[in-house]
């Protein structure tokens, strides 16, 4: 299936023709590099996080910052959809939970419920059954404000913290993000505090009489019924937990949070966990100036885009879900190494020199529950997140260091960092041959059936994209496909290929991202390019190319009623992924690649980069998507530089893992 989005493409550009485009993009990116060598770009989610930020401030009863609230309000109103509500991604369908939170936040800062934009949103909420039909986290937010009874929130007793590790529901069996969000939330559920809410704003008008929350529809019906029955029992016995047991469990939660507080980068370095930690300390009576509460509160502010947004300058403000400096810096370093030349390579070396001391060498994080004898050696995604290094980031940084080390006399500079990273990453391989992002063997699938997990994102099982990056890292470092760990990993990738030839992408949207990742890995692992799996993937990428020469994929491709790839207008990031995937397996001279390169050439903006409103980053399928503002800047440059290099070499072979 193809989508026509612009006029016909030009004839094939020669490498000399793309050189000015490459140089213009390179200069633009170099201008965005920080003096210490790193890059970081805005990371935007949906209306939920900015709305929650407003609600957090009013929950805590903090003085209103009218200027900031006005700018967040402007942001929320701008991204309201034509359907009357708020979506999880640009151009998406109305999401009930995001709409409830955005409406509540706007009302909190003074928007009249009778204003046209509020009336449209309210009508859409009521048409869908009202706020009672929102997801679990939204209902928790409403319960914290006294806008809903806690009986409508699935019960997660704080005593869960005292359960032995063999117990079926244990925090160590959950993904890092679920763990860090849940632990402070357990305290809130136990104490049931009520927001200060000094303006007394509620949203009674969003409820439909006699409507109750809907039961989870996905998952295993037997497990669903079991956990649903258990939830009813837990609600009934909740008032009768022994007080000393409850106090011990709360103490365990506080210890967990405080141990992982992570300075001004916050618990887990993600907004929901950080906000919950602030509310936990508040509910326990910690004053505002208490060191732990104060530093957690400052961590929230670190996520704010206050100095002008890329889209609207200083007219708007929003809160990011987290920060992405390690990821952005490593990927730009790859792009600069591909561009080559003294200036670009110097910037890449500067970036890698910034990354080197960020490596986590001394802290055994939560991952050690499954790998107690493994030495740490990974990188996080954020500025700091020592308990939660990211396998994907680690593999990407390691490959960039390996490539840079081949330049002149730099081998010794990164050798020790690479060795520790390789040791840790390989040690994190799961039993099925693949890798998860933060834990090994985190595949307790029955947990996604508990009522609390209506988001379906409680786990961190092995995924194709992360596993492909690990294969790429190992192969680029010279590990042969005959190595047992490498063979298991390649077998995992081949087994996970979809019938149409694509691969699922967990952390990027979606099948284009997964297929790019897998093709890069299989190429550097020395699978022949005429291998059936590679040929099927190449054919699939060519089949879904848009008529304008680019590629695009909608976030709806993650729908539960799986039908595969969902076409969309071409985007710079997804076009670059498709091109990098095709070029990795010998397709640099194909018509499809020529068309794609032309699309990038034609869509470069005056600054030298590319604009992209669409979301191409994956947070949690069907629940949370990300717009990486850097993706449309460095991935196209990377693809163009690789195209030029392959054309100049007149030998279309890619020797690197990405």
UniProtKB/Swiss-Prot annotation:
How does the UniProt record describe the way this protein sits in the membrane? Answer: Peripheral membrane protein
EC number(s)? 4.2.1.129, 5.4.99.17
Q: Which GO terms describe its molecular function?
A: lyase activity; squalene-hopene cyclase activity
Q: Which UniProt keywords apply?
A: Cell membrane, Isomerase, Lyase, Membrane, Repeat
Q: Is the Zinc-finger keyword given for this protein? A: no
Source organism, top-level taxon: Bacteria
To which pathway does this protein belong? Answer: Secondary metabolite biosynthesis; hopanoid biosynthesis
Q: Which Pfam families match?
A: SQHop_cyclase_C, SQHop_cyclase_N
The record's subcellular locations are: Cell membrane
Q: Which GO terms describe its biological process?
A: triterpenoid biosynthetic process
PFTB repeat boundaries? 69-110, 418-459, 486-526, 534-584
Presence of the UniProt keyword Membrane in the record:
yes
Instruction: Sum up the protein's function in the record's words.
Output: Catalyzes the cyclization of squalene into hopene.
Q: What protein name is recorded for this chain?
A: Squalene--hopene cyclase
Q: Please name the source species.
A: Zymomonas mobilis subsp. mobilis (strain ATCC 31821 / ZM4 / CP4)
